[in-house]
């Protein structure tokens, strides 16, 4: 039985990308080509390419599925009426005036108390606790105040304060549905010029929404993976996407998830017969080796943190040994890791 330690790997800190490249599609792409069905290191071959070369690995009638969520400026600094400092990270917008948020303070705020945010620009009222989150009531539409006064919530491994460049580059070019507190980073590599080439090659694309939560950065704290409680995220799958999947299957194309968030939404909405059910809801799907994929044939994804649930997910798709070999190669070849880093193209291993 695999344990948490099986998903550890050595990563030199200097390989953690601290800023995005000026040209989105100029990132590197590690293509993990499968030579044999077995999950062994010699059953795959590593091919080093530029991300813009991904067109060479896609076929007419393949369907790329993107997550169109938009990152909101979810981080606030402020104070209590007593003067004590606080930090707020919005996790989810519940309705027009209500959010769930993490609140860091020297003393836990109580229900009914007031928190002053953004140098006193406005105040929120603390509501009931929901698991580890606080309900916060905003005096005006929450998304308006978040956009006006919040700060972009860069991941904890990026060490600089967010600036105007990050506000552009930590968003996909197709982001349109505000609600995420982390970017669906595989999509950061796509630009309009690459989309034009994909169109010319007959590659189709479709969109879903999954609002990425801060839980994506939470570490797994149990060696026994079955004891891990996965965070929950809201997603929506449209009838148009469900039809696009049916059309793709009818034409013999592949369903390729752009990013682990797209994959998690697709597999959450997938039916036993391999079709996709339109609808929306919360998902806490936890994909580990042994999972049987219902829908996704391939995945475009960035490189993930050691011992993370996302490293377990890609291992389930491509094979534990294949991913170990790929990550060794990536470290040796000095690929850039994590949100602002490079990407890989993985195909589903036989039987997964």
From Swiss-Prot:
GO terms for cellular component: cytoplasm. Its main location: cytoplasm. One of its GO terms (biological process) is tRNA wobble guanine modification. It is an enzyme of class 2 (transferase). Signal peptide: none annotated. It is found in: Cytoplasm. It catalyses: 7-aminomethyl-7-carbaguanosine(34) in tRNA + S-adenosyl-L-methionine = epoxyqueuosine(34) in tRNA + adenine + L-methionine + 2 H(+). Monomer. Transfers and isomerizes the ribose moiety from AdoMet to the 7-aminomethyl group of 7-deazaguanine (preQ1-tRNA) to give epoxyqueuosine (oQ-tRNA). This is S-adenosylmethionine:tRNA ribosyltransferase-isomerase. It comes from Cupriavidus necator (strain ATCC 17699 / DSM 428 / KCTC 22496 / NCIMB 10442 / H16 / Stanier 337). The gene is queA.
